[in-house]
Amino acid sequence: MRGKFISLEGGEGSGKTTAIHFIRQWLDDHKIPYIMTREPGGTPLAEEIRQLVLTPRDESVNDVTELLLVFAARAQHLAEKIQPALEKGTWVISDRFLDSSYVYQGKARGGDIAMLDQLANWVVGDNKPDATLVLDVPVELGQERVVQRQHQDRLDKESFAFHQKVRDGFLERAEADPKRVKIVDASQSLESVKSQIEEQLAKLNEAWAGDC
């Protein structure tokens, strides 16, 4: 049986690293084979592209350049890591995937959605996530968390208005596709966030049990 593909999304400071720990615990407890990965990145070549995308630099990065770099990394990621794992029946948990492109390069940067659609169809095709968990926090809280980080990347340093568009974009994605995209209120306590994530995973696992 083909594995299941779950993406984890959210703005900067939404707590994805902690959420990944909770997801890993739940999968281990339920003895579900899985791999954890991330975007941009996930393979040696894609990780090199990640550095090009996220490293702060004096030269400004053209919006189209950023978009194409992200999709180049995604093509490699899919071919070398995601698709082989799914074909083996392994679950794939990815820290960011296609929704981030629509939100960051589309909504927040004002990118061409028609171009995004074409790239998504060409690069991703039918390999879209079976489910997506969006960690939602008010931008103010996310920014408070970001400033506590020892290292901040190029996206961390974007304006408040940019990050507000990111939050709005993820909420719009959830509203447009509520069956696939589920919101987790990540402004709550860690115990609450863990409980919400476990509840969503349990529902998904139960629903997918019929695919066996």
From Swiss-Prot:
Keywords noted in UniProt: ATP-binding, Kinase, Nucleotide biosynthesis, Nucleotide-binding, Transferase
Entry GO CC: cytosol
Source domain of life: Bacteria
One MF annotation (Gene Ontology) recorded for this entry: dTMP kinase activity
EC number: 2.7.4.9
Spans through the membrane: none
Enzyme class: transferase
InterPro entries associated with the record: P-loop_NTPase, Thymidylate_kin-like_dom, Thymidylate_kin_CS, Thymidylate_kinase
The protein, known as: Thymidylate kinase
